């Protein structure tokens, strides 16, 4: 094979001086099939082919039967230089590691630095951290890559400054001196060899100079001898070409041997045919032979200075047992194996087996998608019958069917041995089911075996039928049971449903009734709301009336006060003297009374006697007596007496008892009640009890100056306080009442209201009575009884009651 270089020396020098960056070179490794002509010589056009395009069909690529390897893109791999193909770049012979830049199922692309890139990298002082520029690429087949890429360089080995060392990139870094190299050395070609004796050292020095100068000086094609892997090289050839190259190859020895053989044949023929030839003829033959020898010597001498012609080469591929190529080397073994593997996969995918074969046309159309070479495909379809692909347990079989079409299928590889051991001559015989080694293979035995199998199958079918009948009977029984259960469950669920429907109806009725009740309540609520609004309006009216009544009561109280002042103030002095006299008379009379006995009034009523009190009885002689009972109620109720009843009054005490007392002109009435109304009385609507509590004149002045005082409870009078009370004139007294009525005094008209109470409490002096208050009475006119009653100095207004 020829080894081609990338570019001549001038091209390398131009790339070195060019400011533009050189394009990345690509090299392709492809095995070329040796097509022999009829005369046995090689086609010279194949030797002149250089870089091939990578886009070749599958049939043109070198394939391998091994499994597809997985490569890491961007990883560094060590290469095995012994497995490099002959057409690999010369730069790659000195490179230790390469980088996988891409791979497919057919080829692998590796990148590596050229010697120019290494020289520029190691000569630069600030070296790049990423290493030299990988400006060279080599595309190899996946089969070659599996052999060449020995191992992957681990990432731990790439740590540090390992990539800055020349021993990492080069196999023998001692052969290269990058520091001493210069661009001038690149332009200087190596001197040509002068003599034949100096060829070997000149060639070695030229090789070293070429490696240093990155291919400079390589413009001449040289012929080398390539020994294939299928033949064992001789010891001399292996010693002469340790690296695969032989710079000197002489063809003269072969030519001389051929000439010698020809001469010997001629001599033998001449000796046999022309034994009686003359001496002159012998001389001519000797002269011719000598001339041939001299001519051959001259040719040999001339050929030592000329470039040798192409040596006839012939690739011989060893044929294995059963190889359909029969020693022919039209296609490589790798392509054969790949094509066979493709056919095997296709037939397996179609399920081709005995009894279900695949037709030739369908198999060929499917195989054309994977095998581009139709010649190889047709060759395999014709000669692959009976072959077992490498690494497979199936054998290719083919034959013509009854219609004359070719059909293909796969059978186990050990079936041929089974036929041989069984002694079957039929190449398409397949053991029947249940056949064992040693069984009879005759047709009768086969029929008996088939009959036996049929009987067994019939028994099994009968058993299956019985089982099916049993299952059907069980199924019928289960259907009956399930039907009865379903009916019972249906009836129970129907009853429950009816109950639920009834309950639902009841609930609906209740809901409707509740809805009616709710509507009724809503109506009532509206009515109540209206009533509340009306009551609210009435309440407002009542409040307004109450305000008016309070104003009326205030005006009435002011009129009573003015009346009191008119009655009491002009006679303060006379009243004091009369009171002293009455007290003295009363004390003198009470000394003769026996304590502890009950006292009676003129009317016969019994008065409860107290241990420490005296009874004051007012007779016709108007003598004041000491009272022997205590007033326990906080206040007294006095009614206006009738004018026609005279001076008779009813005294109400703490026990709510009344006794009539004959009032004289000088008698002081304590309490009076008039159940009847005279003909000249007030109207019934104005009749109301009035409570009047009268204090002493001094207290009255103090009370009127300081304002009205309404204590929570009225006080009762004791004996000492009663003695101090001044006697008031009787209603029939000519001294007071007559003058009062004669003077034209008129009682103001009372309004239509109830609950009027006039009180006055003596708060100037402490009271020793049980009720804690001292009261003094004054007589006023009673509107209902047309008489005069005892009236106090304070008017208490009670809340009116509305009917």
Swiss-Prot record:
Residues 21-64, 264-333, 651-688 are annotated as: Disordered. The keyword Cell division applies. Residues 296-313 have a biased composition (Basic residues). One of its GO terms (cellular component) is nucleus. Residues 450-567 form a coiled coil. Residues 51-64 have a biased composition (Polar residues). It is found in: Nucleus; Chromosome. GO terms for biological process: cell division; chromosome segregation; meiotic cell cycle; meiotic sister chromatid cohesion; reciprocal meiotic recombination. Its main location: nucleus. Residues 39-50, 283-295, 314-333 have a biased composition (Basic and acidic residues). The lineage of its organism: Eukaryota, Viridiplantae, Streptophyta, Embryophyta, Tracheophyta. It comes from the Eukaryota. Plays a fundamental role in building the proper chromosome structure at the beginning of meiosis in male meiocytes. Required for the transition from leptotene to zygotene in meiocytes. Required for homologous chromosome pairing. This is Protein AMEIOTIC 1 homolog. Keywords: Cell cycle, Cell division, Chromosome, Chromosome partition, Coiled coil, Meiosis, Nucleus.
């Amino acid at each position: 094979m020829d080894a081609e270089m990338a570019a001549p020396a001038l091209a390398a020098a131009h790339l070195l001086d060019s400011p533009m960056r050189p394009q990345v070179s690509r090299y392709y490794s492809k095995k070329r099939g040796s097509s022999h002509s009829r005369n046995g010589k090689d086609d010279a056009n194949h030797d002149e082919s250089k870089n091939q395009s990578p886009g070749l069909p599958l049939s043109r690529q070198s394939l391998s039967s091994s499994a597809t390897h997985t490569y890491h893109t961007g990883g560094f791999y060590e290469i095995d230089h012994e497995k490099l193909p002959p057409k690999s770049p010369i730069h790659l012979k000195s490179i230790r590691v390469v980088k996988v830049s891409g791979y497919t199922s057919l080829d692998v692309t590796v990148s590596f630095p050229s010697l120019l890139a290494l020289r520029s990298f190691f000569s630069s002082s600030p070296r790049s951290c990423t290493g030299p520029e990988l400006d060279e690429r080599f595309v190899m087949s996946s089969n070659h890559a599996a052999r060449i890429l020995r191992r992957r360089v681990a990432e731990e080995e790439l740590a540090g400054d390992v990539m800055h060392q020349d021993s990492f990139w080069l196999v023998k870094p001692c052969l290269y001196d990058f520091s001493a190299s210069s661009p001038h050395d690149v332009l200087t070609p190596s001197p040509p060899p002068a003599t034949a004796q100096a060829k070997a050292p000149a060639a070695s020095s030229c090789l070293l100079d070429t490696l240093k100068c990155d291919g400079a000086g390589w413009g001449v094609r040289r012929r080398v001898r390539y020994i294939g892997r299928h033949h064992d090289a001789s010891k001399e050839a292996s010693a002469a070409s340790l690296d695969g190259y032989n710079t000197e190859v002489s063809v003269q020895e072969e030519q001389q041997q051929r000439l010698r053989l020809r001469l010997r044949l001629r001599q033998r023929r001449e000796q046999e045919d022309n034994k009686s030839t003359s001496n002159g003829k012998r001389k001519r033959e000797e002269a011719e032979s000598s001339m041939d020898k001299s001519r051959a010597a001259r040719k040999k001498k001339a050929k030592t200075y000329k470039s040798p012609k192409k040596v006839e080469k012939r690739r011989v591929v060893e044929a294995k047992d059963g190889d359909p190529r029969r020693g022919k080397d039209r296609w490589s073994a790798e392509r054969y194996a790949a094509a066979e593997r493709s056919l095997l996969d296709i037939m397996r995918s179609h399920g081709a087996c005995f009894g279900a074969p695949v037709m030739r046309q369908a198999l060929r159309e499917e195989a054309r998608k994977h095998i581009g070479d139709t010649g190889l495909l047709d060759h395999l379809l014709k000669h692959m019958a009976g072959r077992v692909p490498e690494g497979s347990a199936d054998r290719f079989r083919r034959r013509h069917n009854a219609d004359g079409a070719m059909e293909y299928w796969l059978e186990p590889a050990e079936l041929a041995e089974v036929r041989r051991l069984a002694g079957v001559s039929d190449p398409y015989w397949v053991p029947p089911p249940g056949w064992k080694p040693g069984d009879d293979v005759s047709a009768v035995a086969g029929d008996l075996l088939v009959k036996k199998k049929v009987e067994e199958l019939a028994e099994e079918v009968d058993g299956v039928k019985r089982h099916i009948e049993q299952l059907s009977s069980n199924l019928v029984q289960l259907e009956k049971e399930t039907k009865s259960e379903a009916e019972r469950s249906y009836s129970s669920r129907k009853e429950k449903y009816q109950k639920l429907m009834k309950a639902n109806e009841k609930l609906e009725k209740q809901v409707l009734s509740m809805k009616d009740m709710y509507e009724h309540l809503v109506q009532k609520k509206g009515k109540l709301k209206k009533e509340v609004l009306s009551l609210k309006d009435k309440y407002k009216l009542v409040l307004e009336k109450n305000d008016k009544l309070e104003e009326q009561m205030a005006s009435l109280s002011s009129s009573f006060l003015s009346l009191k002042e008119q009655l009491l103030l002009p006679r303060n002095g006379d009243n004091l003297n009369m009171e002293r006299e009455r007290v003295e008379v009363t004390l003198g009379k009470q000394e003769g009374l026996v304590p502890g006995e009950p006292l009676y009034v003129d009317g016969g009523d019994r008065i409860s006697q107290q241990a420490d009190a005296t009874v004051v009885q007012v007779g016709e002689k108007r003598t004041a007596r000491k009272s022997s009972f205590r007033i326990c109620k906080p206040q007294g109720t006095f009614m206006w007496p009738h004018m026609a009843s005279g001076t008779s009054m009813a005294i109400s005490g703490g026990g709510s008892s009344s006794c009539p007392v004959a009032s004289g002109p000088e008698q002081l009435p304590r309490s009076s009640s008039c159940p009847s109304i005279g003909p000249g009385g007030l109207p019934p609507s104005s009749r109301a009890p009035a409570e009047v509590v009268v204090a002493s004149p001094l207290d009255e002045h103090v009370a009127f100056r300081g304002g009205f005082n309404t204590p929570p409870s009225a006080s009762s009078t004791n004996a000492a306080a009663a003695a101090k009370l001044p006697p008031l004139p009787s209603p029939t007294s000519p001294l007071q009442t007559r003058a009062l009525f004669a003077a034209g005094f008129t009682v103001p008209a009372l309004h239509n209201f109830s609950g009027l109470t006039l009180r006055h409490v003596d708060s100037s002096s402490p009271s020793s009575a049980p009720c804690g208050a001292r009261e003094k009475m004054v007589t006023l006119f009673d509107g209902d009884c047309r008489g005069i009653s005892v009236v106090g100095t304070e008017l208490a207004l009670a809340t009116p009651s509305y009917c």
